């Protein structure tokens, strides 16, 4: 998303620490956390989403993980208060149920190791409006497609706490702990975690960095990377410098590893050209797959009304870069699709960005 800077504190950062309202809300967070047996970040998320009405927020917390209004066709199933819900087993709403059979087919393929899938998505955690419903919307897609890896950008602490509760089947690695940050989620049953590394961007003005995670999948060594490169047209120079650092780190990864970068690059095509394009051994997955029109634009203010921008902007901010292992092409990109194209009950989309679902064949 095009932002000039990120908050150094939570959604109430505009209030001074000494104001009575701030103290009152802090006490409410403590009370909520005590009743719900959750941490303060989760308490703040639920209270803020429910206009700081304690009873309403608690009711929201203890309701089914998927809203009843969006799942009338299935039997009601309440989870125990404070219990951890496995994201991969959580039922989803009717608005995307038509895709379930496809998801089931993919799950079977994933079990035999022949397919590797991931999602990359800027989830716009900095937009506090309808945050909880939008988080549920994102999670419904994660549940439906059950990807092996998830790359996220613009995560905030309450959203991270929500994901930890809902996605117990994933290991979550974050790029930082405060403000807003990136995250990589690894399906524990499929992806073996080895190590992680955070590479700072020395001249960023927006708390940006490069998150790298080394893993293995079906005997294949992978280096996974994500970032949220500097935003807005006015910061193009810094963004291009960060992009060059990403390419350098992809080149430096061990030759035995397949390298995948997926994230919100904020790049314009002419900026890639100014940087000299991509190295010969690194490809842009969208271009490699023939530049499919249906998933070209991931930030589209004509189709996506979340920001309320009058101008029609269509940009391919979210990109996937791929470097095959030197020993041979054991993992090959196969398809790319957009996610999050349907409005939620609140009348908004899960994010101002569309998500990207990428599937790759694994040659066993």
Curated annotation (Swiss-Prot):
Keyword Transcription regulation: no
Site description Interaction with 5' end of substrate DNA, residues in chain: 180, 299, 317, 353
Cofactor: Mg(2+); Mn(2+)
Compartment annotation: Nucleus; Nucleus, PML body; Nucleus, Nucleolus; Cytoplasm
EC number(s) reported in the record: 3.1.4.-
Cross-link Glycyl lysine isopeptide (Lys-Gly) (interchain with G-Cter in SUMO2) mapped to chain: 23
PTM field: Ubiquitinated by TRAF6.
Top-level class of the enzyme under EC nomenclature: hydrolase
Modified residues (N-acetylmethionine): 1
Residues recorded as bearing Phosphoserine in the entry: 95
Catalytic residues (UniProt): 264 (proton donor/acceptor)
Major subcellular location class: nucleus
Pfam family name, one: Exo_endo_phos
Region of interest (Interaction with 5' end of substrate DNA), residue spans: 122-126, 228-233, 266-268
Biological processes per GO annotation: double-strand break repair; neuron development
Record flagged with keyword DNA-binding: no
Any one annotated GO CC term: aggresome
GO molecular function term, any single one: single-stranded DNA binding
UniProtKB keywords: Acetylation, Cytoplasm, DNA damage, DNA repair, Hydrolase, Isopeptide bond, Magnesium, Metal-binding, Nuclease, Nucleus, Phosphoprotein, Ubl conjugation
Residues that bind Mg(2+): 124, 154
UniProt cross-references to Gene3D superfamilies, sorted A to Z: DNA helicase RuvA subunit, C-terminal domain (1.10.8.10), Endonuclease/exonuclease/phosphatase (3.60.10.10)
Assembly and interaction partners: Interacts with TRAF2, TRAF3, TRAF5, TRAF6, TNFRSF8/CD30, TNFRSF5/CD40, TNFRSF1B/TNF-R75, ETS1, ETS2, FLI1, SMAD3 and ACVR1B/ALK4.
Main function: DNA repair enzyme that can remove a variety of covalent adducts from DNA through hydrolysis of a 5'-phosphodiester bond, giving rise to DNA with a free 5' phosphate. Catalyzes the hydrolysis of dead-end complexes between DNA and the topoisomerase 2 (TOP2) active site tyrosine residue. The 5'-tyrosyl DNA phosphodiesterase activity can enable the repair of TOP2-induced DNA double-strand breaks/DSBs without the need for nuclease activity, creating a 'clean' DSB with 5'-phosphate termini that are ready for ligation.
Family assignment from sequence similarity: Belongs to the CCR4/nocturin family.
PANTHER family: TRAF AND TNF RECEPTOR-ASSOCIATED PROTEIN (PTHR15822), TYROSYL-DNA PHOSPHODIESTERASE 2 (PTHR15822:SF4)
The protein's name in its UniProt record: Tyrosyl-DNA phosphodiesterase 2
Gene that this polypeptide is encoded by: TDP2
């Amino acid at each position: 998303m095009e932002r000039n800077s990120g908050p150094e504190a939570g959604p109430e950062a505009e209030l001074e620490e000494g104001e009575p309202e701030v103290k009152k809300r802090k006490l409410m967070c403590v009370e909520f956390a005590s009743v719900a047996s959750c941490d303060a970040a989760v308490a703040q998320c639920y209270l803020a989403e429910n206009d700081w009405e304690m009873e309403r927020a608690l009711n929201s917390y203890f309701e089914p993980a998927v809203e009843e209004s969006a799942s009338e066709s299935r039997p009601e199933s309440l989870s125990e208060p404070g219990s951890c819900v496995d994201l991969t087993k959580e039922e989803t709403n009717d608005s995307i149920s038509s895709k379930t059979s496809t998801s089931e087919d993919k799950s079977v393929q994933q079990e035999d190791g022949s397919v590797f899938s991931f999602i990359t998505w800027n989830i716009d955690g900095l937009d506090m409006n309808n945050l909880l419903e939008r988080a549920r919307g994102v999670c419904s897609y994660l549940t439906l497609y059950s990807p092996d890896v998830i790359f996220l950008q613009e995560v905030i602490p309450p959203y991270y706490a929500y994901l930890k509760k809902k996605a117990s089947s994933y290991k979550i690695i974050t790029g930082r702990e405060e403000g807003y940050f990136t995250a990589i989620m690894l399906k524990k049953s499929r992806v073996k975690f080895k190590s992680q590394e955070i590479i700072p961007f020395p001249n960023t003005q927006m708390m940006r960095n490069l998150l790298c995670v080394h893993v293995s999948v079906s005997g294949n060594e992978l280096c996974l990377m994500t970032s949220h490169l500097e935003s807005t047209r006015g910061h193009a120079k810094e963004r291009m410098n960060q992009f060059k650092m990403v390419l350098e780190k992809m080149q430096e990864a061990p030759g035995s590893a397949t390298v995948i970068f997926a994230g919100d690059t904020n790049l314009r095509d002419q900026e890639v050209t100014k940087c000299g394009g991509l190295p010969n051994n690194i490809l842009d997955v969208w271009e490699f797959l023939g530049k499919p029109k249906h998933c070209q634009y991931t930030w589209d203010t004509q189709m996506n009304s979340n920001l309320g921008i009058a101008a029609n902007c269509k940009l391919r901010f979210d990109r996937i870069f791929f470097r095959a292992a030197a020993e041979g092409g054991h993992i090959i990109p196969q398809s790319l699709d957009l996610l999050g194209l349907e409005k939620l009950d609140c009348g908004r989309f899960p994010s101002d960005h569309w998500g990207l679902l990428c599937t790759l064949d694994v040659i066993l």
